[in-house]
Amino acid sequence: MELETTKYFILAFTHKSMSLEMREKLAINSPAILKEFLQTIKNYCPNIKECMVLSTCNRFEIYASLKHNTHADEQKNALLKILAQNKKMSVSDLEKCVLMSTDESAVHHVFSVCSSLDSLVVGETQITGQMKNAYKFAFEEKFCSKDLTRLLHFAFKCAAKVRNLTGISKQGVSISSVAVKEALSIFEKEKIEDKKALVIGLGEMSQLVIKHLLNKQFEVLVLGRNAAKFEDFLKELEEPKKVSFQNIENLNAYINAYELLFCATSSPNFIVQNCMVKETIFRRFWFDLAVPRNIEKPIFNNIFLYSVDDLEPMVRENVENRQESRMKAYEIVGLATMEFYQWIQSLEVEPLIKDLRELARISAQKELQKAVKKRYVPKEYESNIEKILHNAFNAFLHHPTIALKKNAQKEESDVLVGTIKNLFNLDKSSTNHAQNLNLYKCEYYEE
């Protein structure tokens, strides 16, 4: 009897392989569109058991588990066709930029991404939260179950270990902090004394920008749609008096009044359009941190626009400064990948061990009941004898249990498990799926 091991599969498009223009086309910022896309995969790729999508400003990735004996290349071709049709792109263009990973390399990739080793800004912690949200959505919409839950559960543990055992996140660097650092450098070079900034949007990226600006003693005007959300956000700030709010409908009134602007919304269209921009005597510095981009390319020469990809050179110094921590982090990820597969293999024997113990308990209980019924054993001794039998079978199964767990990490474990199931007639035994899933349910709500 051959045990089916989970086949993990990933398609990845990242800032390393794909331009910002193409990543914009792939980006999914709407829950409704994401659900529709995942449903399309489910409908047209029957050999994909579970799937989820991670869509950020720097990457678009599909994580999946495949049915037994499924060819990864076939699933890759099917998914590229779905993407091409869904995003109105050519398969050949996507083929040039895609990275496919399976099995151990796929697991290693997920752990590296979650630990922020594959990020534009190495060590930034925002990606872990984004992965938790992506998993949460797919899990609650029933597109992923046991396989991806186990994978993501372990990935978050790996990311926490990387943060705790290396100094890779101590500087708190992120896209938002790099952007604010560059803005501060510009202000110093330009000798601009009036430290004011306009921030469009109130999502996670914008909130990080605001916090970094406040740390650098800027006054901030936020343009958004949700005043209640802004009031809740103020409670997180040490200096809330330096931040004010206006509805984004008033954008025209403020767009030409600030030298510094940051924009990061989930809108698929341009928020800042050239038709609303007027010429000014002062130079302006705009940071578009959204994907798809929120700011139309300016027509005036004294407006300097920075996109996410434009920040990459500013990030290189950060990467170089973290090489030692990065090497240690990769060691942790490599070890975690190995431990993950050992854990997965051990899970195959856990139900068997449970079934063996249950079989022993039931057999002992039956014989004890017979003995009591035939008065071989006084009724008042029944409880004590039951405890003795329980301890005896635990002692009897102790060594086999250890041996099973040890051999679960070996390639021949499927033969051993199959043989034991046949010997004890346990082939038809099954553990409740929902209970099994809860054991490995990922705490996506944790920090």
Swiss-Prot record:
Q: Which reaction does it catalyse?
A: (S)-4-amino-5-oxopentanoate + tRNA(Glu) + NADP(+) = L-glutamyl-tRNA(Glu) + NADPH + H(+)
Question: Which amino acids does the record list as binding substrate?
Answer: T56, C57, N58, R59, S119, E124, T125, Q126, Q130
Q: Where is this site: Important for activity?
A: H109
For this protein, the Enzyme Commission number is 1.2.1.70
InterPro entries (UniProt xref): 4pyrrol_synth_GluRdtase (IPR000343), 4pyrrol_synth_GluRdtase_dimer (IPR015896), 4pyrrol_synth_GluRdtase_N (IPR015895), GluRdtase_CS (IPR018214), GluRdtase_dimer_dom_sf (IPR036453), GluRdtase_N_sf (IPR036343), NAD(P)-bd_dom_sf (IPR036291), Shikm_DH/Glu-tRNA_Rdtase (IPR006151)
A Gene Ontology biological process term: protoporphyrinogen IX biosynthetic process
- One Pfam family name from the record? GlutR_N
Supply the enzyme class, top level: oxidoreductase
Q: Which GO terms describe its molecular function?
A: glutamyl-tRNA reductase activity; NADP binding
Q: Where does NADP(+) bind?
A: G201, L202, G203, E204, M205, S206
Q: Where is the active site?
A: C57 (nucleophile)
Keyword Oxidoreductase in the entry? The reply is: yes
Pathway assigned to this chain's UniProt record: Porphyrin-containing compound metabolism; protoporphyrin-IX biosynthesis; 5-aminolevulinate from L-glutamyl-tRNA(Glu): step 1/2
Keywords attached to this entry: NADP, Oxidoreductase, Porphyrin biosynthesis
Q: Does the keyword Nucleus apply?
A: no
Record remark on domains: Possesses an unusual extended V-shaped dimeric structure with each monomer consisting of three distinct domains arranged along a curved 'spinal' alpha-helix. The N-terminal catalytic domain specifically recognizes the glutamate moiety of the substrate. The second domain is the NADPH-binding domain, and the third C-terminal domain is responsible for dimerization.
What family, per the record? Belongs to the glutamyl-tRNA reductase family.
Q: How does it assemble?
A: Homodimer.
Query: What does the UniProt record say this protein does?
Result: Catalyzes the NADPH-dependent reduction of glutamyl-tRNA(Glu) to glutamate 1-semialdehyde (GSA).
Q: State any further remark.
A: During catalysis, the active site Cys acts as a nucleophile attacking the alpha-carbonyl group of tRNA-bound glutamate with the formation of a thioester intermediate between enzyme and glutamate, and the concomitant release of tRNA(Glu). The thioester intermediate is finally reduced by direct hydride transfer from NADPH, to form the product GSA.
Quote the NCBIfam families the UniProt record gives: hemA
Question: This chain belongs to which protein, by name?
Answer: Glutamyl-tRNA reductase
